[in-house]
Curated annotation (Swiss-Prot):
ATP binds at G230, P231, P232, G233, C234, G235, K236, S237. Its EC number is 3.6.1.-. It is found in: Mitochondrion inner membrane. InterPro entries: AAA+_ATPase, ATPase_AAA_core, ATPase_AAA_CS, BCS1_N, Mitochondrial_chaperone_BCS1, P-loop_NTPase. Belongs to the AAA ATPase family. BCS1 subfamily. It holds the Pfam family AAA. It comes from the Eukaryota. It comes from Xenopus laevis. This is Mitochondrial chaperone BCS1.
Amino acid sequence: MPFADFVAALKDNPYFGAGFGLVGVGTALALTRKGAQFGMIAFRRHYMITLEVPSKDKSYQWLLSWISHYAKNTQHLSVETSYLQHESGRISTKFDFVPSPGNHFIWYRSKWIRIERNREKQMIDLHTGTPWESVTFTALGTNRNIFFNILQEARELALKQQVGKTVMYNAVGAEWRQFGFPRRRRPLSSVVLEQGISEKIVQDVKGFIENPKWYSDRGIPYRRGYLLYGPPGCGKSSFITALAGELEYSICLMSLSDSSLSDDRLNHLLSVAPQQSIILLEDVDAAFVSRDLNKQNPTAYQGMGRLTFSGLLNALDGVASTEARIVFMTTNHIDRLDPALIRPGRVDVKQYVGHCTNWQLSQMFLRFYPDQTAGQSEAFASAALSSSDKISAAQVQGHFMMHKTDPDGAIQNVCLATM
């Protein structure tokens, strides 16, 4: 059969014509779909702007709060439970609804913004056990200012929730994470130290914060170290907490006896500590002791973790140590500390915080019972010191708590409380 006749026969075949038509339609639809996909990709690349924020970024929680503030009409929600501490000290539970994983649309400054919250089910954070998440913002246009404005608003919204409070951070892995809920700032006047001690430290810290240029002009590393030492319960940690509130700083808590703490991790944590924060190393004598004692008891000197003594020294003032840093250390036994740890440059200010004096006892009495006279406060101080000359601030506070509304009872029973 000639080829021309074969083609003519195919044209006259209705089944072939129908099949060829379907193939043509399918091909056209496929090409149209591919063209639409490429067109959408090109449109998004040239006429849309996208911002992705992973859950490890510090602004992630800020943005979730911001989204819940703007996406009030969304019907797909997740719940976040938090605790609130009231002025009275009472703690209540608060439930916040945030958009669940998926796509959400909000109207912001005359623009529609698509928000996609993704949750990876196959990957989790080993420290918290929570899945990895990310939030992606997509908007029309190429102006980045819209995302900058969103981040600024989210930050301001988060800061409003922390006004009048002190934020505590704890070292988790290679980063600092907020520990618990922000605490009400403790007034500096609520911690009564011996006359002049509080004022001396506050003046020194503020002078350090306000004069970075003085350090740079003289080539001095811009960092400051403090050591508060003395018997337990005398107000060392309480004063640091109140000082952070006075400066409107946060506190970064770090345990040197943490078994997972190594030299590299300590260096990294000190370098990424939140700005405007005090790094607090409590009970440093529990992690390291004097090298003289090391010869007698090498196991105790090594501590519980992988952190070495030389690693700690280098982190405090070595070549790789960071600047613009305030470190407070506390100890109950300064004699157990190696002189190399507390030399100038690593510890610039050493301050003894001891047992209560007559003046301290009088001031504490007047603070708990502001309506009482100076004569009654002196009577309380004299009675307390006559029974013992080693009274801690924690003991006095516990005694006052037993006589909240009975100042006379506090004076009469002080001997029993200090025995």
